[in-house]
From Swiss-Prot:
Pathway per the UniProt entry: Carbohydrate degradation; glycolysis; D-glyceraldehyde 3-phosphate and glycerone phosphate from D-glucose: step 2/4
Keyword terms, alphabetized: Gluconeogenesis, Glycolysis, Glycosome, Isomerase, Peroxisome
Catalytic activity: alpha-D-glucose 6-phosphate = beta-D-fructose 6-phosphate
Name of the protein this chain belongs to: Glucose-6-phosphate isomerase, glycosomal
GO biological process: gluconeogenesis; glucose 6-phosphate metabolic process; glycolytic process
Species annotation: Trypanosoma brucei brucei
SUPFAM superfamilies given in the database record: SIS domain
Motif mapping: Microbody targeting signal: 605-607
Length: 607
């Protein structure tokens, strides 16, 4: 196979050195140099169906024409820009909550928007969405449907998998969750010694942890405060140890969340929790028989393993192979959420997601929030070469949202092979990072404002706070609005000069020395997402919006967004290394680095 570089032609006439914008030809199509220089290792067998689209060629031309145009010029030319490049979706709630997207602070104009919408059409996005909603096996590498939408199908319309309506089974599990969660919340469910449950410990990892953690944190104002929730995910013994120190084990319910009930991290932690319970009872001379069934429930599909663990089958909550881990918070995996906020609020969470499902399936493309969000992202990733995307929630309750969206986006679209089995010919999923509110401003916003990488941002805020304390929320939201504006408009050298002179600086030398440091070039893009208030319904809408954004981007790139083979290799190697971690043992069957690290561990770990 020839090297990818052998197939490239750098247009030196338009290189950065000559003041133009470099491009590289793959076949007959020119891709921006800043994009292709990152695609090392992509060979002649690359999948070029995306880059062969007429709309892709048009977008490349539009990038060359408008890519350097300051965003603020669009606002100067159009006083209604903010209104024209925004969409409001009613969530259908009594409190008149809504989801509002403003994408006007982007390098977008009508021509670019039309070309992006044509790209979605050329890539068959509407047809793909219909395939997903019909229950077709769109997860091709695992031959599975992708039907988390069925879990929040509040219309209760039939949804079929292999000719069978899944809604009766979905509703049955939801009713089972309702009955059990109400027993825990009311104190009817007792531990082995007769104490009511006051602590709930969820043991899971990945999708079995990130979604429940994020949602219970986000919806704390709706929680039952005399129940404390804890989450154990890391196989580092410190995680389970610290949680066990903080609870009354006689009043604790452990939720073991593992579809197969064989996940190494989860089962290791669950066994340690079971050992802690049994050791506690034995140390006090209490008969341990039947105790595990009183203190453990399972979110799993493996009946046999659950029974072997000691959990009553009646307390096993099922879900299905068409529910992917990172899309599972709507399923039985959401049991800790329901225990925390109650059945009615959990249904509100599902309803918010369902509203966006309906919007996504039926709204016209030019008003379709997940579609627009995805297309703006593709524009920046594939034409501006953006490799990171910041999630910036201005609501402390959403502090775990960036971590949740890291898995959702990066595990879904962090791939370099298309559904055809060929390598991609473009960049795919970005690095997702973020932090809540003004904390991020004092950590990494410096790089977003003045760094050398273009980092598109999503600012997420609520108009009404759940905690009305003095002027806190006004101060908070003034920063929210200011940051989106500052990133876009920047600050020119002349503005800096006037500011320094107004502050009393008279030395031209000092002013000239400070000018480059205090200048902001601006043109840093952002989306603004506003809700009226952070309710269960609003949270459901936000999460569903991002799920569908990921779907659209994956479909445009031609990758399978619903498998995660990249998670497996390290796990396999870890299983072979585990028996080698023994005091005094020397290994030499790895590379010299890994051999040395293992040998150092074996030499010192037992001391």
């Amino acid at each position: 196979m020839s090297s990818y570089l052998d197939d490239l032609r750098i247009d030196l006439a338009a290189s950065p050195a000559s003041g133009g914008s470099a491009s590289i030809a793959v076949g007959s199509f020119n891709i921006p140099y800043e994009v292709t220089r990152r695609l090392k290792g992509v060979g002649a067998d690359a999948d070029t169906t995306l880059t062969s689209c007429a709309s892709w060629t048009q977008l490349q031309k539009l990038y060359e024409q408008y890519g350097d145009e300051p965003i603020k010029k669009h606002f100067e030319a159009d006083s209604e820009r903010g209104q024209r490049y925004s969409v409001k979706v009613s969530l259908g709630s009594k409190d008149e909550n809504f989801l509002f997207l403003d994408y006007s602070k982007s390098h977008i104009n009508d021509e670019i928007k039309c070309a992006l919408l044509r790209l979605a059409e050329e890539r068959g996005i509407r047809q793909f969405v219909q395939s997903v909603f019909r229950g077709e096996r769109v997860n091709t590498t695992e031959n599975r449907p992708v039907l988390h939408i069925a879990l929040r199908n509040r219309s209760n319309r039939p949804i079929y998998v292999d000719g069978k309506d899944v809604m009766p089974a979905v509703n049955k599990v939801l009713d089972q969750m309702r009955s059990f969660s109400e027993k825990v919340r009311t104190g009817e469910w007792k531990g082995h010694t007769g104490k009511a449950i006051r602590h709930v410990v969820n043991i899971g990892i990945g999708g079995s942890d990130l979604g429940p953690v994020m949602a219970t944190e986000a919806l704390k104002p709706f929680s039952q405060r005399d129940l404390s929730l804890h989450f154990v995910s890391n196989v580092d013994g410190t995680h389970i140890a610290e949680v066990l120190k903080s609870i009354d084990i006689e009043a604790t319910l452990f939720i073991v969340a593992s579809k197969t009930f064989t996940t190494q991290e989860t089962i290791t932690n669950a066994l340690s929790a079971r050992r802690a319970l049994l050791d506690y009872l034995r140390s006090r001379g209490i008969d341990e028989k039947g105790s595990v069934a009183k203190h453990f429930v399972a979110l799993s599909t493996n009946n046999q393993k659950v029974k072997e663990f000691g959990i009553d089958e009646e307390n096993m909550f099922q879900f299905w192979d068409w529910v992917g881990g990172r899309y599972s918070m709507w399923s039985a995996i959401g049991l800790p959420i329901m225990i925390s906020i109650g059945y009615e609020n959990f249904v509100e969470l599902l309803t918010g997601a369902h509203v966006i499902d309906e919007h996504f399936a039926n709204a016209p493309p030019e008003q379709n929030v997940p579609l627009l969000l995805a297309l703006v992202g593709v524009w920046y990733i594939n034409f501006f070469g953006a490799v990171t995307h910041a999630i910036l929630p201005y609501d402390q309750y959403l502090w775990r949202l960036p971590a949740y969206l890291q898995q959702l986006d990066m595990e879904s679209n962090g791939k370099y092979v298309t559904r055809s089995g060929k390598t991609v010919s473009t960049l795919t999923g970005p690095i997702i990072f973020g932090e809540a509110g003004t904390n991020g401003q004092h950590a990494f916003y410096q790089l977003i404002h003045q760094g050398t990488n273009l980092i598109p941002c999503d600012f997420i805020g609520a108009i009404q706070s759940q905690n009305k304390i003095g002027d806190h929320h006004k101060i908070f939201m003034s920063n929210f609005f200011a940051q989106t504006e500052a990133l876009m408009i920047g600050k020119s050298p002349s503005e800096v000069r006037r500011e320094l002179e107004a502050a009393g600086e008279r030395s031209a030398e000092k002013i000239n020395a400070l000018l480059p440091h205090k200048t902001f070039i601006g043109g840093r893009p952002s989306n603004t997402l506003l809700i009226k208030s952070l309710t269960p319904r609003a949270l459901g809408a936000i999460i569903a919006m991002y799920e569908h954004k990921v779907l659209v981007q994956g479909a445009i790139w031609g990758i399978d967004s619903y498998d995660q083979w990249g998670v497996e290799l390290g796990k396999v190697l870890a299983k072979s290394i585990l028996p080698q971690l023994r005091p005094g043992m020397r290994v030499n069957n790895h590379d010299s680095s890994t051999n040395g690290l293992i040998n150092m561990f074996n030499e010192l770990s037992h001391l």
